[in-house]
Amino acid sequence: MKPLSSPLQQYWQTVVERLPEPLAEKSLSAQAKSVLTFSDFVQDSVIAHPEWLTELESQSPQADEWQHYAAWLQEALSNVSDEAGLMRELRLFRRRIMVRIAWAQTLALVTEESILQQLSHLAETLIVAARDWLYDACCREWGTPCNAQGEAQPLLILGMGKLGGGELNFSSDIDLIFAWPEHGCTQGGRRELDNAQFFTRMGQRLIKVLDQPTQDGFVYRVDMRLRPFGESGPLVLSFAALEDYYQEQGRDWERYAMVKARIMGDSEGVYANELRAMLRPFVFRRYIDFSVIQSLRNMKGMIAREVRRRGLTDNIKLGAGGIREIEFIVQVFQLIRGGREPSLQSRSLLPTLSVIAALHLLSENDAEQLRVAYLFLRRLENLLQSINDEQTQTLPSDELNRARLAWAMDFADWPQLTGALTAHMTNVRRVFNELIGDDESETQEESLSEQWRELWQDALQEDDTTPVLAHLSEDDRKQVLTLIADFRKELDKRTIGPRGRQVLDHLMPHLLSDVCAREDAAVTLSRITALLVGIVTRTTYLELLSEFPAALKHLISLCAASPMIASQLARYPLLLDELLDPNTLYQPTATDAYRDELRQYLLRVPEDDEEQQLEALRQFKQAQLLRIAAADIAGTLPVMKVSDHLTWLAEAMIDAVVQQAWVQMVARYGKPNHLNDREGRGFAVVGYGKLGGWELGYSSDLDLIFLHDCPMDAMTDGEREIDGRQFYLRLAQRIMHLFSTRTSSGILYEVDARLRPSGAAGMLVTSAEAFADYQKNEAWTWEHQALVRARVVYGDPQLTAHFDAVRREIMTLPREGKTLQTEVREMREKMRAHLGNKHRDRFDIKADEGGITDIEFITQYLVLRYAHEKPKLTRWSDNVRILELLAQNDIMEEQEAMALTRAYTTLRDELHHLALQELPGHVPEDCFTAERELVRASWQKWLVEE
C-alpha cells in the first residue's frame, strides 16, 4: 500500500483530534489511517459505530462478499415489526456495507468491476427486501392482489440506468419503474381494493421507506421519472398499460434508457420472463436501425448544452470524453444492431464493449482504450463520491480533496492525475466524434436555431439561463420557462404518436423564436400553449402550423392581440384553416354577402342531416367571427363597421335557422292553409336591443320576438293536421331549439324572447294584430322605449310593413312631456340600482352613470317625446343615426349630437376591445371622464331639468 502523501499526513492529525478516545488510543493499522484520512464519510460512520472499524480490521472486505448481502440483511430485519423499524435497519445496513465498500475501494483491495458489482447488488438487495416486507404488510392490511383466476400478483421493479446495468456509482439516485402483471382485486382483506390502488399505495410506501430522510439518513434517492408519462403518469402500471405505451408512444430516449432495464430480485419467474419478452421488441428492432445515431447525437447535444448552461466544468461524467460518451458509443451499437445480434443485448457496458470488439464494430485498439478509460473514470468518480457520500462528478478545486484523489488514484500529485485524465478523455472524445459527432461545424444561424431547440427540448428550470431569452425581464423569463415546462408535463399526459412528437419538435423552436421576440412573450405563450394542448393529438393541425410559417405568424399575432380569439381557436381548432389565407382572414365578408356565403357553405351538408346542418352553422359563424375580430385587431374595421358585420352575420344565421325549422315543421305538419293563395310564410322575427340597433358585440345575445299573421281558423295541410297558430308556436320553439342546441362547436346564440308581449308569461309567438293591440293598450313606457330599437330581421314584406306601421304609430303617439320624462328617468334609476357597477373605483361602461345606457335612454326619450311632431325620427333603430335625425330635425343641436355620437362610439369601441381581451366591461374610475361628463350634462338637460 502506498504511503500517505505529505498533505494527507498533515491532515491525519486533524482526523486524530476528531476520533473518540477508544479509537484514538487504539493502535490503528496503516490501512485504517489511510481510509480515515481519505474519506470523511468513513470517518463519520466509524465514529458513530466503532464496532464497524473493529469488524473491518478483523474481516477485511472481499470481492465476493456481495453474495452474503441478502442473508446479512435478512438477519438484520428478523426482529423488525413495523415500518419505522424497517426504515432504521435498511439505513444502518446500507451505511455499514457502504463503509466496507469504501474501505475496499480506497485501498484497491478489489477490482473496479467488483466495486461496481457490490454497489449494484447492495442496492438491489435493499430494494427487494423493502419491497417484500411491504408486500406482506400491505397484503395483511388490504388483502392479496389477484388476477381474474385468483392468482397472486407481484410487484415487479425495473432497475434502470446504472442500477440495471450492474454499474451503480458510490453515491447515486436509483431510477425505478414499477409494474404489476394483470388487473384484478385484492382477496382476504377487510375491504376489496383493485390492483391498481393496491400497488399504487404500496409503491408510495416503498418510495418513502427508501427515500425519506430520517436521523439515520436515507437508503437511496428514488427517481420515478423514467416511467411512462413521467411525473404525470401513474406510479405503477399494469403489463398491458406498459405495452400499449411503448408500442404507441415510446420515444428514442426511452429505448435508450430501456437497454439497461433489469428486473430486481427473482428475474426468472413467469411474470419476469413475460415482462422481459414484452419490452424486448421495443428496445431492439428486428432491422438495422441507423436512425439511432441522430437520436443519440441529439441527446448528446442536449447534454452538452446543459453542461454549458449550468457551467459544469471539470465534469468527468457529462463533459467531452466523459463517462456518458462511452455509454453512448456502446449503446449506439446495441440499438442499431441489437435486434439482429443477441450478443449485444447485455445490460452491462464492459461485456458489451468486448462483444463490439469481437464483432469488429470497433477496432481492438479503440475498444481497449475505451475499456481502460471507462475503468479509470469510474474509479475516479466513485472515489470522489466516497469522500463525503456525495453525488458529484465535478473534480474538486480545494487542495485537500485533490491530494486525496491523486493519492487514491496512485499518482504523485494532482497535475499527474489530470494529465492522465486528459489523455483518457481525449481518446474517448476521438472515438465518439468518429462515430456520433456532428458532421459539420454549426453556422451562426444553425447555432441560434439550436438554442431555440434547446429551449424547447431541455426542460430548463426557472433559474436556468439561456441567451435567447436574455432580452426579457427576469419575471417574464421565469414565466416563459415555467410555461414551457408545464406544457411539456401536459404533453406527457396525452397520447401522442411518434409522428406527432416529431412534428411538435420541429414546430416548437420556430414558434418559441417568434413568440419570445415579442415584449409580451409570456402572455402570448400562455394563450398559445393552451391552444396547442387541445390539438397535440391531432397531427394534421400541428403540420399545418409547422409547414405554413405564415399561418403560424398569424396565429401568434392574433393570440397576442386577443385571448378571446385564442380561446375560440383552442375550442374549435377547425378555425386554424382560416389562418392559411391572409386575404380572407383580415377581410371580412361583404355585409350584404353573408346570406349567400352561408347558403353556399350549407350546400356541402346533406339537407336532411340535422346534426351536420347545426354543426355547419356554428362553424360558419365562428369562422366569420374570427375574420371580423382579425380585421378589428388589424384596424381595418372601425367600431361601427364591426357591429354592422356582427349584425349582418346574425341576420344570416336567423335566416338559415328559420329556413331549417320551416322545412322540418312543414315536413311534419304541412303548411298553414292561409298561405295557399299568397307568397311568403306569414312569419316574422323582430330584433330588439343590440340586434335591432345594429350594435351587436362579439358575445351579444339576440333579443327576439316572433310574429305571425295566421287567422284563427287556419289549419295545416299535411297528413298530421294541426291548428295553424299551433304550427307557428312549434316553429318558434324549433327555432329556439336550433339556436340553443349545444354541439361539439357550442351553441349558435343565446336567445332572449322576454321582450314579447306580457314577457315570459306571454305566448312565445304572437299574432300581428295581438302585438299591435298590446302595444297600444297594455305596453309600459319602457316597452315603447324598447320599440325604438326594434326592427324586422326576418319576415314577409307584408308582415314587415305591418310591424313598421305599428312601430311608427306607437312611437308617434302624442305624449305628455313631463310624465314621459319622469317615467324614463325613473326606469333608468331603477336599472342603475339593479344593474349598476358593483366594483368600487371602477366605471361600468354600459350600466354606470354617464355610460352607454344613458345615451340610449336619451335618444329613446327624445324619439318618443318628439316623433309626434317629427315622424321622420322613427326611420332608424340605431342610436348613431337617431342622433343624426335629432340634429337634422332641430331637436338637438348638431354639436351636442356629434359629441354624444363620438362618446357613444368611443365607449362601444372600448367594449369591443375588452371583449377581445376577455375582460369585463368596466375600467378604472378615471377613464373616459370627458365622455362621461358630456353624457351627464346631456342627461341633466333632457331628463332632469324642467
From Swiss-Prot:
MF terms in GO: [glutamate-ammonia-ligase] adenylyltransferase activity; [glutamine synthetase]-adenylyl-L-tyrosine phosphorylase activity; ATP binding; magnesium ion binding
Enzyme Commission number, as recorded: 2.7.7.89, 2.7.7.42
SS bond list: none
A Pfam family assignment: GlnD_UR_UTase
A GO BP entry: regulation of glutamine family amino acid metabolic process
This protein's UniProt keywords: ATP-binding, Magnesium, Multifunctional enzyme, Nucleotide-binding, Nucleotidyltransferase, Transferase
Keyword presence, Nucleotidyltransferase: yes
Ranges where the record places region Adenylyl removase: 1-440
Catalytic activity: [glutamine synthetase]-O(4)-(5'-adenylyl)-L-tyrosine + phosphate = [glutamine synthetase]-L-tyrosine + ADP; [glutamine synthetase]-L-tyrosine + ATP = [glutamine synthetase]-O(4)-(5'-adenylyl)-L-tyrosine + diphosphate
SUPFAM superfamilies the UniProt entry points to: Nucleotidyltransferase, Nucleotidyltransferase substrate binding subunit/domain
Swiss-Prot/TrEMBL cofactor(s): Mg(2+)
Region entry Adenylyl transferase, spans: 449-946
GO cellular component terms, semicolon-separated: cytosol
Family named by the database record: Belongs to the GlnE family.
HAMAP family reported for this sequence: GlnE
Xref: PANTHER family: BIFUNCTIONAL GLUTAMINE SYNTHETASE ADENYLYLTRANSFERASE_ADENYLYL-REMOVING ENZYME, GLUTAMINE SYNTHETASE ADENYLYLTRANSFERASE
Function: Involved in the regulation of glutamine synthetase GlnA, a key enzyme in the process to assimilate ammonia. When cellular nitrogen levels are high, the C-terminal adenylyl transferase (AT) inactivates GlnA by covalent transfer of an adenylyl group from ATP to specific tyrosine residue of GlnA, thus reducing its activity. Conversely, when nitrogen levels are low, the N-terminal adenylyl removase (AR) activates GlnA by removing the adenylyl group by phosphorolysis, increasing its activity.
NCBIfam families: PRK11072.1
Protein name: Bifunctional glutamine synthetase adenylyltransferase/adenylyl-removing enzyme
The species this protein was found in: Escherichia coli (strain SE11)
The gene coding this protein: glnE
